[in-house]
Amino acid sequence: DIIKIGGKWETSFKFIWERFVIWLNNLFSKKNLFTVSIANTGFNITETSQFKEADIIHLHWINQGLLSISGIKEIFSSGKPIVWTMHDMWECTSICHHAYSCDAFKTICRNCPMLRFPHSKDLSYHVFKKKETLFRNVPINIVSVSKWLAGLAKSSTLIKDKHIEVIPNTLSLDDFTIFDKQESRQTLNLPKEKFIILFG
C-alpha cells in the first residue's frame, strides 16, 4: 500500500525549509542548493498504523523534507529490523549525495567543497556529528545498488561497521523487452548513424 503523509502545503513547507536553511548557511548562495540535503525537517512516520504493523522497515531515498535525522532516530529506536537501500552517497557522507573527489567522509566531513565558504565547523561538520550519533550502535542493514557504492559505504566512518550487501537495480524483461536496435531506430524515426543516450 502507498500512504500519503502530510498535505500539499506541509510537504512544500518542509522541502522549502530545508532548502532555506542550506541557502542561509551558504550565505545566500544557490551554489549546490539541490546537491546537498541536511535532513533538518521531515515527517514522523512512526505514529502511522502502517509503521506500527510493519515487521521490518525498509528505507530508500528519504531527503528533501521527507524524513529528518530526528525522525530517522525515532525509526531506529522502534526496535524493528531496518534495511536502508542506498541510491546515492548521502547515508555515508554528511550532506552530499555524491562526494565527487572529496573523501572527507572516510574520516570526518568538514571544509565541505559543496559549500560556498567551507570551514572546520561548517554545516557539513554539524550534520556529520548528528549522523555519527544517529548511526552509533544501531544494527541496520545497508543495501547498495552497486559494488562501487558499497565500496564507498565500507570506507565511510559513519556506516563502515554496518552489514552492507549489494543488490543491483534490475529490470524485468517481462515488462521491458529488448528490440533490434536498427529496427527500433526506424520505427521511432531516429537517426541511424548518431550515438543516442536515452534516460527516464
Regions found by a protein language model. Name each.
Residues 1-56:
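A conserved catalytic-core segment of Leloir-type glycosyltransferases
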Residues 1-4, 52, 77-81, 162:
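N-terminal subdomain of nucleotide-sugar transferases
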Residues 2-9, 15-16, 71, 94-99, ...:
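Short aromatic-enriched loop/helix-cap "lid" or pocket-rim segments at secondary-structure transitions
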Residues 46-66, 81-87:
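Short N-terminal targeting/anchoring amphipathic segment
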Residues 56, 81, 140, 194-195:
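Alpha/beta-hydrolase fold active-site loops
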Residues 70-79, 130-134:
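Catalytic-core regions built around general acid/base machinery
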Residues 91, 104-181, 187-190:
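Donor nucleotide-sugar binding/catalytic pocket of nucleotide-sugar-dependent glycosyltransferases
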Residues 143, 191-200:
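Conserved donor-binding/catalytic core segment of Leloir-type glycosyltransferases
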